[in-house]
Amino acid sequence: MRLKFVFSRCENVQISRDDNVSAIKNSHVVILGVDPSQVEATLSDIAIVEALRGKLLISIVAGWTRGAIERLIDAEWEVWEGIRDQDTRGAWVLRTLPNVAALVSQSLTAIEDHPSPTFPPQFKDIATAIFTQIGKPMSIPPALMPATTAVSGSTPAFWAIIVDSLIDAAVAVGLPRKVAQEQIYQSMRGSAEMLQSGIQPGELRDMGTSPEGCTIAGVMVLEEGGVRGVLGKALRESVTVARAMGKVGGKVGEKGGEEVHVNDTRKI
């Protein structure tokens, strides 16, 4: 109902509920945006499979590889391996991954490079145009998608925890919470823009530190507390779980699964 309200004034937008087959039949491009646990049930509907035939299916579902989705769409996936033409395949599946910053049109959206030489190039252009509307799209090789799932998809939550801890500390030393929030948010935004301008992280750190100063004192506490190791391990753990999620469509190393990595935090 919320989407219906948002788009109620858009003449060229139609809201369809409880009739996915009809919506797919009347569309050229379909975005698969269900919960990961609902992918199999959604794509097990033969009517949906038939409606998808020959169309571009853009997946934004974390953990589901392109191969796993394609096998769900049609049990004859192994036959399609050598055919790859739009008339005989179930759908052209393009794996993507936006993040929560799409809410403010600042998403970093990973668009997986499709391995098929016959993948219609206009489909990649369509996906890029779509995700440009909500932030910055980036082409990513298939082997890097598990890492990107965490680096792009998980880090907003990490930033939120870091920012929340800094705000609480600012309140503890006397700042009103709203003032602390405004200062920390702007500091984070300014730092991000400086880094995006080409300034290196170490360079930015050195800009704010002076001998016996307050900033270097705080930096030393972070270093002594092992902040680099903790953040690094948190990110590697997220990537490890992302690889495990990729096993949905097959065992590790098989089509649809994700390759293990030497720096994974554990074996799953």
Task: Describe each region flagged by the PLM.
Residues A62-W64, P98-A102, S152, S187-R189, ...:
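Glycine-rich beta-alpha junction loops
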Residues E182-I268:
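NAD(P)-dependent Rossmann-like dehydrogenase/reductase catalytic/cofactor-binding core
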Residues D18-I111:
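Rossmann-like NAD(P)(H) cofactor-binding subdomain of soluble oxidoreductases
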Residues M1-E11:
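NAD(P)-binding Rossmann-fold cofactor-contacting core
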Residues N12-S22, M138-I140:
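Short acidic-hydrophobic, aromatic-tinged amphipathic segments that line or gate anion-handling sites
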Residues A68-W92, L108-A147, F158-S197, V241:
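Internal alpha-helical scaffold of NAD(P)-dependent oxidoreductase catalytic cores
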Residues L94, M145-A150, P201-D206:
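Short pre-catalytic strand/loop immediately N-terminal to key active-site residues, enriched for Gly-Thr
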